[in-house]
Swiss-Prot record:
InterPro entries: Asn_synth_AEB (IPR006426), Asn_synthase (IPR001962), Asn_Synthetase (IPR050795), AsnB_N (IPR033738), GATase_2_dom (IPR017932), Ntn_hydrolases_N (IPR029055), Rossmann-like_a/b/a_fold (IPR014729). It comes from the Eukaryota. Coiled coil: none annotated. It catalyses: L-aspartate + L-glutamine + ATP + H2O = L-asparagine + L-glutamate + AMP + diphosphate + H(+). L-glutamine binds at R50, L51, A52, I53, V54, N75, G76, E77, D98. It is an enzyme of class 6 (ligase). The gene is AS1. Pfam families: Asn_synthase, GATase_7. This is Asparagine synthetase, nodule [glutamine-hydrolyzing]. GO terms for biological process: L-asparagine biosynthetic process. The record marks E344 as: Important for beta-aspartyl-AMP intermediate formation. Induction: By darkness.
Length: 586
């Protein structure tokens, strides 16, 4: 994948404008260090920074149809491109690049071809015959994309905010699963799955083999590559299943013939972190070539400004988790690996976050999963995309495969609910689907390991260390006046205030701050789910430890010595235990 920048309908076609667009495109160079390109057609500019994964030799962009009347710049991976080529027998392709099909599909089907694409993508397509254009983003928003409007009437498209924020009067997140047409001058949704209507509660019975097969297909199709790759392996359920399925099926792929059947795996954490221990155990079980990266709290703190610049957010949960991922991505890229397969999306689909223990019924459980999936592009998708692309590393996420989501979201949510009296913990149906006694995918205790949020699993001292650091830079007086300084998404903790100050230095525009989600949350819940328990209403910390009793000791005993002199109640949340045994921050 890559970084894209397009300026459409610009009133200035001078050389100076071209130079400026090249300058802005270079702000995205980290996303595509292998090659860059800029195509100008009249008052339209399409720029591209390429990370070459498929057909590195001839897949440079922009891409064209036969007579070059259709021009495409795209950030994406089209997993069914070979099947689509077979449906276009009368077309000539200039490259083997998977995204080469887009221009030709448009020629055949007009604007209504986007749902034919199986993959992740953000693209701009310019039809020079009538000077019209379309822009589209993948179903869930795995790829990042923004749209802006200039005072001269131009439309700007960029993979990251930093490509357009200094030039546009207004800009916003390009909505996932949508297409923007210059002819209609509006967005329209091309992705319309049944679960988008939250009022419709699915009733399909749970079939473990159907779920297992759907996930295996999602992983296998993502092994399309002409360059070395690896897997992120924290030792949690999601990354372990991804690694297990990848290792199991890698030998029969073209990738194995090129790069060998030994799968590289990667894990990051503080010294002694839960993830390092569990990741090593899973790697030994699967026989991967495992790499561990230890970081210190100071390493993470030193990286926070870079993390905020690259992730373009001030959301607390995202920054906490993105920092170790950012550090690990640099190490991975230096090893020669160009992309990794990762486990994002499972918790949203299956209700894996620990607050789902309190879901009152199947209807509200399902509706919350719908809300969580719809918001992924602002949270985990953003983190996984931008913290890896900061170093020119691509992340692929099989749990967010369109076909797999359909299978998983069609299941009656009654089967997903946590039921202690029946021995069902969070994500029980996913665990059960891969519980194979004869040919085990994972060790039993790993398969049934309880949920750890990434920012917790890398080491409980990490979050406490950030809070300590923020407390030294944000005073009580600053917090007292926070609502006047930041009236939108007012930070309610010193950590949040610290992140916000950094974000505003990089992205001071009002449009920029509006791209970041806000509102109260407990252990990553949506605001609506807080209604499930009255004691959650005063929650200030989105960490998973705010909803899990076994983590109380981490809050009590892992405080960094630098907090000396800071009142503990300002740093450490108070924990109460609910009747379900779930610790809730109060």
């Amino acid at each position: 994948m890559c970084g894209i920048l397009a300026v459409l309908g610009c009133s200035d076609d001078s050389q100076a404008k071209r130079v400026r667009i090249l300058e802005l495109s270079r702000r995205l160079k980290h996303r595509g260090p292998d090659w860059s390109g800029l195509h100008q057609h009249g008052d339209n500019y399409l720029a591209h920074q390429r990370l070459a994964i498929v057909d590195p030799a001839s897949g440079d962009q922009p891409l064209f149809n036969e007579d070059k009347s259709i021009i495409v710049t795209v950030n994406g991976e089209i997993y069914n491109h070979e099947e689509l080529r077979k449906q276009l027998p009368n077309h000539k392709f200039f490259t083997q690049c998977d995204c080469d099909v887009i221009a030709h599909l448009y020629e055949e089907h007009g604007e209504n071809f986007v749902d034919m694409l199986d993959g992740i993508f953000s693209f701009v397509l310019l039809d020079t015959r009538d000077n019209s254009f379309i822009v589209a983003r993948d179903a869930i928003g795995v790829t990042s994309l923004y749209i802006g409007w200039g005072l001269d009437g131009s439309v700007w498209i960029a993979s990251e905010l930093k490509g357009l924020n200094d030039e546009c009067e207004h800009f916003e997140v390009f909505p996932p699963g949508h297409l923007y047409s210059s002819k209609e001058r509006e967005f329209r949704r091309w992705y319309n799955p049944p679960w988008f209507n939250e009022a419709i509660i699915p009733s399909t019975p749970y079939d473990p083999l159907v779920l297992r097969n759907a996930f295996e297909k999602a992983v296998i199709k993502r092994l399309m590559t002409d360059v070395p790759f690896g897997v992120l392996l924290s030792g949690g359920l999601d990354s372990s299943l991804v690694a297990s399925v990848t290792a199991r099926y890698l030998a029969g792929t073209k990738a194995a013939k090129q790069w060998g059947a030994k799968l590289p795996s990667f894990c990051v954490g503080l010294k002694g972190a839960p993830d390092l221990k569990a990741g090593k155990e899973v790697a030994d079980f699967l026989g991967t070539v495992h790499h561990e990266f230890e970081f210190t709290i100071q390493d993470g703190i030193d990286a926070i400004e870079d993390v905020i610049y690259h992730t373009e957010t001030y959301d607390v949960t995202t920054i906490r988790a993105a920092t170790p991922m950012f550090l690990m991505s640099r190490k991975i890229k230096s090893s020669g690996v160009k992309w990794v397969i990762s486990g994002e999306g499972s918790d949203e689909i299956f209700g894996g976050y620990l607050y789902f223990h309190k879901a009152p019924n199947r209807e509200e459980f399902h509706q919350e999963t719908c809300r969580k999936i719809k918001a992924l592009h602002r949270y985990d998708c953003l983190r996984a995309n931008k913290s890896t692309y900061a170093w020119g590393l691509e992340a692929r996420v099989p749990f967010l495969d369109k076909d797999f989501i359909k299978v998983a979201m069609d299941i009656d949510p009654e089967f997903k609910m946590i039921k202690h009296d029946e021995g069902r913990i969070e994500k029980w149906i996913l665990r059960k689907a891969f519980d194979d006694e004869e040919n085990p995918y994972l060790p039993k205790h790993i398969l049934y390991r309880q949920k750890e949020q990434f920012s917790d699993g890398v080491g409980y001292g990490w979050i406490d260390g950030i809070k300590d650091h923020a407390a030294k830079h944000v005073t009580d007086r600053m917090m007292f006046n926070a609502s006047h300084i930041f009236p939108f998404n007012t930070p309610n903790t010193k950590e949040a205030y610290y992140y916000r100050m950094i974000f505003e230095r990089f992205f001071p525009q009002n449009s920029a701050r509006l791209t970041v989600p806000g509102g109260p949350s407990v252990a990553c819940s949506t605001e609506k789910a807080i209604e499930w328990d009255a004691s959650w209403s005063n929650n200030l910390d989105p960490s998973g430890r705010a909803a899990l009793g076994v983590h109380v000791s981490a809050y009590e005993h892992q405080i960094n010595p630098v907090t000396k002199g800071v009142e503990p109640e300002k740093i450490i949340p108070k924990i109460g235990v609910s009747p379900l045994g779930v610790a809730i921050q109060t």
